Every structure is written in C-alpha cells, then in structure tokens.
Amino acid sequence: VYGSVVTAGIHRAPSIKVAEAAKVIENTQRDLNIAFMNELSLIFQALEIDTGDVLAAAATKWNFLPFTPGLVGGHCIGVDPYYLTYRAEKAGYHPEVILAGRRINDEMGRRIARECIRGLLRRKGRGGLVTILGMTFKENVPDIRNSRVIDIIGELQSFGVEVQIADPLADAAAVHEEYGIGLTAIEALRPADAVVLAVSHDQYLAGGWPLVQGLLSEESGLVLDVKMKLDRASKPAAIELWRP
C-alpha cells in the first residue's frame, strides 16, 4: 500500500513491534536533543552568556546537531517518550535519561512565564498585561494539540498576570473547547507591558520588531523571544529582550 504512494523508498521492518519502536525512538531522540538545549540555556543564563551565540559558534563544527531551546508539544515528540518509558517500566526497567529530559521540557513553559514575571516586577513592580503571540504547538500549522503555550498562560495567570493571546492560524472555537481560553485578533490586542513570541509563525517574523514593538504600551517594553527568531541587531534600543 505504502509503495503505491511513497516515492522515497520503503524500509521493511521485520515486525510491527520493531516499526513502532523505531517511530517512538525517533521522537524520543528529538525530545532529548531539545531537552539538552533547554538545560544548556539554563546553564548559559547562569553564566550570563547568550545561548544563541554559543550554538552559532558550535554549529561551525561539521557534525554539531542543530537543535535550539524551546517548548515541546504536539501529539508526537512530547507524548511518545511516555509510551516508551511506560513499556520499559512494565518490562522491569526504569528509564532515567528519557524521564529527565521530559522533566526539563515539561518545565520550560513555566520557566518562560517566571522570566516574564521577573522582568515585569523589575521594570514596573507589578504584573501587568502580557500579550502571547502563538497558541499552536509549533510554527506555521493550525494544530493546537498538546500545545505547551498553555503552560506559559497558566503560570502567568497563577501569579495574577492578565494575559491576551493571538494566533492567526489557530481556530478560536477549538482553542476555547480544548483549553478554556479565548483568542484575540491581533488588531484588537490592547497595548501590553510585555510580549511573548511563543510560536514564531512566519506572519509574526515578517512583521519583525515593528510588529512586536507596536503591541507594547511603551517603547521600552519587555519582549521574550522563545525560539530566538527576532534579529537582535535591529532590536529597538529601549526594548528589554529575553532569550532562553
């Protein structure tokens, strides 16, 4: 069946178990690579050096794997490691590295929210209003399944911070049904104290700094660039930028 539609070739696994295990470890490997980046970003933040600068330098080595820090959601990468660890434990083996990676990635949304709160308190002495750009689980898709942006939202709200969310690709009714939150059209957003670029849709990146700065209540607002996509060289001088 697959051979009739797949032109890149087919690898015939010896059993369905092997095929399923292969798919699970593909996603688990990616999850662990991102967890490594997220942990490195914690280390480099403590050392007061920019993670993006370190990764750019490391990428000059031909065999360095190009992963970046960020949220890990969706119906594959953030889920499959738990299938694997569950079956491993049923078979009598307790995984350590895989679960450690999951803990790091599961904490990333709350970490971003706390960095936002710290920035707001440092600048204004209060929480204020935060605009979150993006609700889908990754860039340039409408899929909201297991989006970890909800972790940022929940943590901010738990500290009394008001949040408004915009995403041109996500279906507002589906978001409300799945997460119990509303979306706001980008042109209807109120000027905010901070902007979190949580999902780097091409539409946001095309708008660049003028778009982001236009969403702030003051020219000297706080911006959190989760995937390090905004060009630092063209950042308006008054804006405070946080990157993982």
Q: Where do the language-model regions lie?
A:
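Structural/interface elements that position substrates and couple domains in central-metabolism enzymes
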Residues: 1-244
